[in-house]
């Protein structure tokens, strides 16, 4: 019963968001470059690139585990299987070979690579700081660009802005040259001068393994930092846990606004969020209901 309710609420939410009226003709859904997918039960990531000939799409390896089932956000009939690079290791601060493919089930249609084109550049392609590197996250929903910084194994570092939770796997391309691969996150080093970081993108083919020490040296050279540093590697996936944290922050923000505005906006926010979260992760319904109670108490 809960699964049927989730699908119903999710469909209503998508229809309201897109402004689809009853009886209107709707095109058959396809897997979109830059679109959102759900890996396993609740991990949200972005499609980097579609390969129509092979019937696969690329995304980040840290989005799931081998064999996880994948659905397209808002079009749950489009399903496939998640296969990460066999060389990827799901370890803290490990970033090498962070790519995966989704092998789609028979009959799933793949859309064009409308952001980047179909050219996939090889790891040996020469890039310089003059090359404009861009991305488009499924959550950010905006084209953002920076410049090439460095390369380590099959990972390319650039000055792209940080992504939001859910942007993992987003397409990263070099304008005029082609696609690098999926967006992997941001690698940071902290020192007495502050925190500095570079964004990562990974060519979707197995490359040389490397460790944290090598990545630290790449960052220190780029930022001209000597001395000890602390390294962290961020991965912008969205799960039920961090989606809830983001919603909590939004509710806190709303509570500080004019009371009448809160009463008008809060029900709409909760309705949309409830549909999305229930469709993605039924087990968090009780959490959302708790937020409703808190919001109602604030409005009294």
Role assignments for model-derived ranges:
Residues 95, 120-127, 165-166, 266, ...:
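Solvent-exposed, acidic/flexible segments
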Residues 30-43, 109-119, 139-224:
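Active-site region of chymotrypsin-like
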Residues 12-14, 38-39, 111-115, 231, ...:
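Intrinsically disordered, low-complexity, compositionally biased regions/tails
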Residues 174-281, 287:
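C-terminal subregion of chymotrypsin/trypsin-like serine protease catalytic domains
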Residues 19-33, 256-262, 280-300:
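C-terminal region of N-terminal signal peptides and the immediate post-cleavage residues
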């Amino acid at each position: 019963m809960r699964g049927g309710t989730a699908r119903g609420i999710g469909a209503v939410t998508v229809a309201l968001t897109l402004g689809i009226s009853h009886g209107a003709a709707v095109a058959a859904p396809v897997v979109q470059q830059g679109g959102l997918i759900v890996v396993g039960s609740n991990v949200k990531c972005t499609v980097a690139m579609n390969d129509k000939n092979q019937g696969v799409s690329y995304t980040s390896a840290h989005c799931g585990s081998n064999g996880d089932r994948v659905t397209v956000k808002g079009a749950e009939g489009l399903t496939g299987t998640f296969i990460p690079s066999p060389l990827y290791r799901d370890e803290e601060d490990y970033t090498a070979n962070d790519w995966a493919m989704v092998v789609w089930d028979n009959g799933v249609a793949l859309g064009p690579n409308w952001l980047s084109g179909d050219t996939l550049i090889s790891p040996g392609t020469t890039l310089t700081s003059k090359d404009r590197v861009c991305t488009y996250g499924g959550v950010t929903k905006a084209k953002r660009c920076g410049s090439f910084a460095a390369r380590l194994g099959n990972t390319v570092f650039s000055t792209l802005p940080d992504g939001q939770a859910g942007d993992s796997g987003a397409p990263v391309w070099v304008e005029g040259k082609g696609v690098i691969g999926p967006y992997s996150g941001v690698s940071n080093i902290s020192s007495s001068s502050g925190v500095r970081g570079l964004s990562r993108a990974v060519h979707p083919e197995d490359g040389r393994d490397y460790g944290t020490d090598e990545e630290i040296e790449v960052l220190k050279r780029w930022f001209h930092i000597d001395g000890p540093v602390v390294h962290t590697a961020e991965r912008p996936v969205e799960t039920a846990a961090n989606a809830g944290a983001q919603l909590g922050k939004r509710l806190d923000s709303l509570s500080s606004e004019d009371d009448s505005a809160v009463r008008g906006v809060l029900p709409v926010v909760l309705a949309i969020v409830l549909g999305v979260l229930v469709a993605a992760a039924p087990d968090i319904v009780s959490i959302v209901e708790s937020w409703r109670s808190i919001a109602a108490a604030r409005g009294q």
